[in-house]
């Protein structure tokens, strides 16, 4: 396609493409241009609202990986994620900014998505039901199964009289039969024992189906699975009694269970045996040769215990003497030889009396042989001990053993314990108040302990708390420790790791039971997060010199007037600091991988815990205020350190640099705040994290209603910072009303920042805010303005704030949305409280002056004008784009041509596509349309060119068309085609058929007459007219002040045409062509000369 034709195509289609580009630019402007985010640092902007969590014992604010920019990019809102780890009451979340505050109770549904204790009237956040099978081996002679249930996480001292705990129903399934039992949780410990009487037929071997092989007898017994469900109690607080046995066959019992009821929870397995097996013996080894064995059990008065004595098979001793000493309450009543053919056993009577020690001499016979015996040792004799009634019950009786060999060689003393009790104990169970320990002692040095109580269970199901004679031992003291009295487990900060289901063993008499706990430890090293690690001087911002501030020593090349004035020095940038970590534990299974408290993508904000142990290594270079704000002091490099409270170990380090380079404040973002709304939502990435979204209300609804402002500053190095973190004494904000009829400004000396009050209805950019340095550092009477910003105001009386403002956005998706608008509240606190660094904003780590920690809100992007440094648009209101349509609705601010915004400007975005997707699709559509137009024009041109190929003979007989070329030196062009003929026949653009291609390619205009029935018609008038008749082009036109060439084609007409041909260029002289070439390129001019010469030759 030749260049002239391409120009023609562009001439026709450029309006369409320009319109599409303009439409696309408006879409992208309303949706938000993602590239504008690059003007900011990694720290997102947000409404600097303060969050506090009340009524919670342990709570943390969170950070999810790679989600801060997506969730906090709006000056109007702030999203924060938090975790309620431990609480005995419903927590309350408070959000405050300036004089406005709002509270919201965190509902239990968000903290407990699936609560098995929904039937109780108590707050059961940390409750966890634990089941203990007292005996997993069940014999036909005693076909009873007992399961102890208790609640972990329930405060034992916080018991109310009207507390209603749920009932538990236990199920045992074997083949097609079911047995059930029930109990109700009660008491301070919240426990109960459920009993099941198994059917005797269950102890027989499993039924063999025809055609299958008979199953081999399992040595571990026949397994039976146990399950339980949770149910509400009756009107009287009792559980519904169920039949212990069911004779009819039920398919695994499921047909008898209400499917709509609570689901079955697995307890574990038990094993059934038909007969008692020989009980296992415990061994008390006296030395390498002799050992005492006994059966661990509880005995009563009159019971006789037998102690077998064995000797190693490889022992070379042929003679030894065993001494057994007892105290009151125990009597040795007999000794008998177990292998009389091998050993000769005799009891000496060296001592007399009822409780005299027994001396037993064993002599190996010469002809004896122990080859018939099996095992590493064989039994020599048995000693019978009778138990008498002790004075105090329960009691522990001791039997002391010692072996003597010829030559006065003796062994160490060995002690056997005999437990005497009138009760028939079947098990002991250690109960812990909590199921987990969060080891914050590593961070704070304060011990974290969990109370433990040990209870015994008798054969009839009676539960008794054991206060004495309990022994305990931790399986790994690098993870968890236990007190000497076995009444609590604890961590003191000296632990090395965490672990899932770490075991602490508790023993009472011959019974023992493990306590499993999960210990979470902070992952080291900790992560120190600083919003800006390179702090610069701020050009033009002078602050008074105090003892803690020193001027930079490397600024000698700068003018002294620039660096300081009247005892002032340049301000250094401030940064925000917080400390994050993950709580982890070694998994219980093999592999050694780490388990996370919330997940590998979540970090916990622990700034408040380690605030007292965080310091700057060189305080002269930088200063840390409140553990959350870092202020540059002097040029240099230093580190932020977190020290261990128990040792000299450094838990974390972060390098900070204070530079000599100066930065300037390039923009001041202003957000109007007339009130706050608060909503809560469950995190989709974790069932324990909760998102809180605080949104600033913007609408002024009644006369004299007051509003506060929130400001962010942007520096030339790209960093953005909320103005709240700077000391209010180092600057002042001056607000000016641009329309005092609509809003007025109060500048009360007691208040740090100006207050805006509504007067009459109106809207627009009505307030200008100036950031001015402190008065003591002004070098002249003219105030030094650091930055200027504008605020968009909308005043509409009597209108609900829900419709016009994005602050009343509704959440979609799972979760609960609760809102409380306080836009009509008047300030109830002095402004210096919320503006000063000593105020409530920086009191704790819940303040979170960092990247946002939460879900999605509207994103507000400060946009720059062309040729300006300002990040605000012409309307000075922020363009919003949604960042996540599933968790927060998108509201788009479409710009108006007149620079104003009506009440319907905020439009709901499609919930199906994201903003980036819509923008990309629009761009793709424009490109596709442009390609389609190009192809259509190519085909059209090819068809026209094919039809224009006429025989050479016909060309000779045709007269040539002649073009009149005119040049205008004026800067005005015709704006429209009003001077052209309006009829359809006279508005046709075509190429004269009287020329061949070589000639027609030099026609620089296609405005020719249209041929109808072989007759050619010319235009009604010439295109170029005298300058007096021309219509002036607007001075702002992009084509103004340029020379324009306009060509008009006049074609030959038939001889009978009433208008003669005039101004034929064929008859023009060569001098007439020269003026045409004044503004053409040399090559184009030469081609025009050649063309004219050919025309002369043809003539």
From Swiss-Prot:
Region (Disordered): 797-858
Its membrane topology: Single-pass type I membrane protein
Gene Ontology CC: membrane
Tissues/organs with expression: Expressed in mature oligodendrocytes. Detected in the brain, lung, pancreas and testis. Highly expressed in mature neurons of the adult nervous system.
Ranges of compositional bias, category Low complexity: 835-848
Keywords annotated in UniProt: Glycoprotein, Membrane, Signal, Transmembrane, Transmembrane helix
Annotated signal sequence range: 1-30
Extracellular topological domain residue ranges: 31-915
Classification via InterPro entries: Ig_TMEM132_2nd, Ig_TMEM132_5th, Ig_TMEM132_6th, TMEM132, TMEM132_3rd, TMEM132_C, TMEM132_M, TMEM132_N
Family: Belongs to the TMEM132 family.
Protein's recorded name: Transmembrane protein 132D
The species this protein was found in: Homo sapiens (Human)
Higher taxonomy: Eukaryota, Metazoa, Chordata, Craniata, Vertebrata
Gene name of the encoded protein: TMEM132D
């Amino acid at each position: 396609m030749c260049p002239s034709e391409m120009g023609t195509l562009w001439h026709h289609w450029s309006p369409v493409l320009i319109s599409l580009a303009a439409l696309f630019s408006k879409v992208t402007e309303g949706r938000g241009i993602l590239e504008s985010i690059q003007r900011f640092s990694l720290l997102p902007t947000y409404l600097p609202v303060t969050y506090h969590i009340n009524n919670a014992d342990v709570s943390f604010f969170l950070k999810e990986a790679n989600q801060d920019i997506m969730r906090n990019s709006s000056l109007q809102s702030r999203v924060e994620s938090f975790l309620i780890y431990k609480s005995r009451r419903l927590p309350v979340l408070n959000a405050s900014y300036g004089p406005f505050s709002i509270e919201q109770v965190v509902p239990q549904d968000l903290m407990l998505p699936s609560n098995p204790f929904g039937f109780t009237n108590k707050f059961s956040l940390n409750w966890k039901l634990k089941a203990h099978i007292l005996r997993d081996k069940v014999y036909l002679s005693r076909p009873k199964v007992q399961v102890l249930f208790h609640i972990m996480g329930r405060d034992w001292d916080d018991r109310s009289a009207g507390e209603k705990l749920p009932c538990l129903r236990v199920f045992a399934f074997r083949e097609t039969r079911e047995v059930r039992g029930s109990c109700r949780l009660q008491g301070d410990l919240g426990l109960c024992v459920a009993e099941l009487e198994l059917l005797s037929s269950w102890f027989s071997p499993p039924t063999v189906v025809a055609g299958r092989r008979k199953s081999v007898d399992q040595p571990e017994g026949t397994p039976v699975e146990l399950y339980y469900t949770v149910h509400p109690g009756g009107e009287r607080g009792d559980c519904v009694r169920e039949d212990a046995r069911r004779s009819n066959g039920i398919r695994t019992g499921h047909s008898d269970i209400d499917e709509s009821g609570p689901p079955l929870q697995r307890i574990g397995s038990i094993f059934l045996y038909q007969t008692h097996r020989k009980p296992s013996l415990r061994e008390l080894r006296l030395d390498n040769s002799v050992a005492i064995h006994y059966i661990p059990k509880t005995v009563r008065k009159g019971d006789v215990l037998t102690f077998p004595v064995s000797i190693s098979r490889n022992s070379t001793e042929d003679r030894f003497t065993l001494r057994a000493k007892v105290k009151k309450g125990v009597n040795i009543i007999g000794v008998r030889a177990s292998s009389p053919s091998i050993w000769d056993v005799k009891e000496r009577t060296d001592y007399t009396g009822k409780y005299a020690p027994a001396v037993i001499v064993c002599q190996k016979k010469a002809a004896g042989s122990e080859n018939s015996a099996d095992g590493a040792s064989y039994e020599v004799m048995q000693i019978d001990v009778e138990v008498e009634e002790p004075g105090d019950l329960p009691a522990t009786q001791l039997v002391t053993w010692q072996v003597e060999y010829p030559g006065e060689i003796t062994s160490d003393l060995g002690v056997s314990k005999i437990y005497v009790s009138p009760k028939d104990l079947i098990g002991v169970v250690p109960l812990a108040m909590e199921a987990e320990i969060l080891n914050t002692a590593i961070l704070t040095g304060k011990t974290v302990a969990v109370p433990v109580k040990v209870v015994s269970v008798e054969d009839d199901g009676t539960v008794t708390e054991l206060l004495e004679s309990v022994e305990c031992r931790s399986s790994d003291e690098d993870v968890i420790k236990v007190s000497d009295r076995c009444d609590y487990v604890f961590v003191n900060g000296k632990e090395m790791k965490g672990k899932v289901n770490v075991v602490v063993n508790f023993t009472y008499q011959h019974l023992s039971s493990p306590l499993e706990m999960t210990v979470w430890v902070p992952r080291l090293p900790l992560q120190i997060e600083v919003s800006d690690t390179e702090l610069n001087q701020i050009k033009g911002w002078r602050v008074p010199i105090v003892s803690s501030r020193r001027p930079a020593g490397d600024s000698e090349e700068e003018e002294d007037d620039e660096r300081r004035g009247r005892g002032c020095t340049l301000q250094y940038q401030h940064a925000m600091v917080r400390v994050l970590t993950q709580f982890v534990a070694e998994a219980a299974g093999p592999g050694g991988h780490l388990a996370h408290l919330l997940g590998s993508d979540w970090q916990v904000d622990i700034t408040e815990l380690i605030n007292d142990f965080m310091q700057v290594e060189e305080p002269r270079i930088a200063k840390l205020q409140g553990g959350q704000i870092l202020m540059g002091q002097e040029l240099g490099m230093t580190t932020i350190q977190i020290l261990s409270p128990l040792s000299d170990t450094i838990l974390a380090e972060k390098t900070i640099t204070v530079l000599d380079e100066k930065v300037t404040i390039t923009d001041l973002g202003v957000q109007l705040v007339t009130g706050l709304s608060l909503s809560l939502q469950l995190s989709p990435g974790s069932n324990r994290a909760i998102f809180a979204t605080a949104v600033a209300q913007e609408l002024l609804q009644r006369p004299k209603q007051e509003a506060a402002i929130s400001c962010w500053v942007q520096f030339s190095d790209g960093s953005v910072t909320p103005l709240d973190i700077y000391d209010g004494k180092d600057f002042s904000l001056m607000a000016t009303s641009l329309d005092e009829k609509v809003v007025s400004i109060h500048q009360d000396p007691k208040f740090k920042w100006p207050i805006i009050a509504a007067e009459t209805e109106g809207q627009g950019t009505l307030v200008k805010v100036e950031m001015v340095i402190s008065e003591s550092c002004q070098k002249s009477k003219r105030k030094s303005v650091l930055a200027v910003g504008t605020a968009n105001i909308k005043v509409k009386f009597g209108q609900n704030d829900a419709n016009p403002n994005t602050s009343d956005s509704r959440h979609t998706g799972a979760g609960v949305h609760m809102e409380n608008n306080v836009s009509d509240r008047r300030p109830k606190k002095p402004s210096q409280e919320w503006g000063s660094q000593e105020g409530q904003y920086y009191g704790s780590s819940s303040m979170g002056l960092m990247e946002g920690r939460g879900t999605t809100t509207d994103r507000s992007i400060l946009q720059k004008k062309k040729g300006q440094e300002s990040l605000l648009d012409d309307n000075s209101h922020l363009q919003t784009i949604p960042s996540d349509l599933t968790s927060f609705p998108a509201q788009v601010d479409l710009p108006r041509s007149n620079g104003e915004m009506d009440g319907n400007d905020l439009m709901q975005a499609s919930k199906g596509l994201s903003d980036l997707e819509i923008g990309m699709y629009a761009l793709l559509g424009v490109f596709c349309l442009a390609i389609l137009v190009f192809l259509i024009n190519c085909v059209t041109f090819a068809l026209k060119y094919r039809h224009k190929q006429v025989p050479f003979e016909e060309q000779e007989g045709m007269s040539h068309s002649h073009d009149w070329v005119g040049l205008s030196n004026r800067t005005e062009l015709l704006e429209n085609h009003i001077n052209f003929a309006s009829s359809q026949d006279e508005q046709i653009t075509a190429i004269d058929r009287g020329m061949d291609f070589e000639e027609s390619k030099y026609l620089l205009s296609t405005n020719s007459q249209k041929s109808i029935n072989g007759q050619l018609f010319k235009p009604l008038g010439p295109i170029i007219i005298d300058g007096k008749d021309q219509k002036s082009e607007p001075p702002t036109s992009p084509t103004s002040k340029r020379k324009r060439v306009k060509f008009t084609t006049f074609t030959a007409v038939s001889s009978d045409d009433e208008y003669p041909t005039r101004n034929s260029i064929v008859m023009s002289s060569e001098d007439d062509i020269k003026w045409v070439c004044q503004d053409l390129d040399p090559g184009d001019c030469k081609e025009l000369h050649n063309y004219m010469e050919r025309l002369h030759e043809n003539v």
